[in-house]
Amino acid sequence: MKPTKVIFVLPLFLLIALAAGAPDEAMGRVTKVIDGDTFDVQLQDSSLSEDLIRVRLADIDCPETRGSKACEAGKNASAYTRSWLLSTYIFLDLDDKTGKDQYDRWVAVAYLSEGGVPGRNFNKMLVDAGHAEIKDFENNEFDPWSWWS
C-alpha cells in the first residue's frame, strides 16, 4: 500500500473506532431529578421510541431519599445531581445488555455535554464527590472499574 493511502486510511479507521465507543446513544435535557441516581430526560434525536425516559445511573448507588432508609446523605446526593443536571443537556451511554432495570428505568452512564460533545462522566463524578458508592451490577454491560480508576 502506498504511503498516501495509509495516511488516508489510518485516520478513517481511528474515527470509526472512536465512534463505536462514543457515549452518545441518546442525548437530551434533564427535566426532573428523582434522587441522586435517578432522573428524567427529554430525549432529542434518539433512536428510542420514547421521548421522555427515566434513567437509573449504572453501577452506582446513592443513599435513599424516601422510605425507611431515607437519610440526609440521600438528600445531599439529590441536591448534587440537581445542581449539575437539572435543565441541562447530557449524553447517555445506554445499557446494551438489558436496557432497563426491574423498575422500567433505562440503565445508563451519563456524560455532561461540554461544548456539544460528551464530557465528564457523571456517574464517576457522584462517586468522586462522595455521594455514591460503586456497585457493579452484573446484569448490565458496564464495568465501573474501567471508568473509575
Regions picked out by a protein language model, each given a short descriptive name:
Residues 5-11, 15-149:
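Small beta-barrel nucleic-acid-binding modules, primarily SNase/OB-fold domains
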Residues 1-2:
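N-terminal secretory signal peptides that target proteins for export/translocation
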